Amino acid sequence: MNTWRNLPGKLKVSLLSLHPRLRREALRCGEDLNAAERELFLTLNRYDLAHSLAMARRLGDDPLLKRAALLHDVGKLRHELNIFTRWLCTFLEIFLPGRLRQLCATVEEKARGEGILERIRSLPRGWRRGFFVQAHHGEIAGALLRRAGSAEELVRLVEEHQHEPRDEKARRLRQADDAL
């Protein structure tokens, strides 16, 4: 993702996140999800809620894509990815992308375990764990959605939303995510 190109979308979502009825809209849109998915969706912070809702509006013509839009960022674990770490990632992506790649590679080497959730827990709390969560939030979301009993096609779309799209639905999801 090119953060400079995406800046207008980020500003729009930042403004949407301030809307006093954001939570009410999230509750209404969350009715399309199963109970476990809804619980995951409602744990998103205000910015991620606004981002997911804006994506869902863009993709609302397809029920599967709408659900994927609502759930694609549930892997951005609120207690692991704080605002400081998010801003640090964005700053490094814009101004020092080589340093960001280097830091991510170092964190990647230190993560141990079988599954993605075990690998997160193997890292010390703080920016390292936050960087790992930011880099792997699609896979994390996929693991959480599997536990929630989500349909495999939904899990695949969410899990792979940071990767090169392999079909039309994945392309549309990625395009909406990159625009906002």
Residue ranges and their predicted role:
Residues 1-40, 160-165, 178-180:
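Non-catalytic interface/linker regions that flank or bridge core catalytic/transmembrane domains
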Residues 42-180:
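Divalent metal-dependent catalytic cores for phosphoryl transfer on phosphate-bearing substrates
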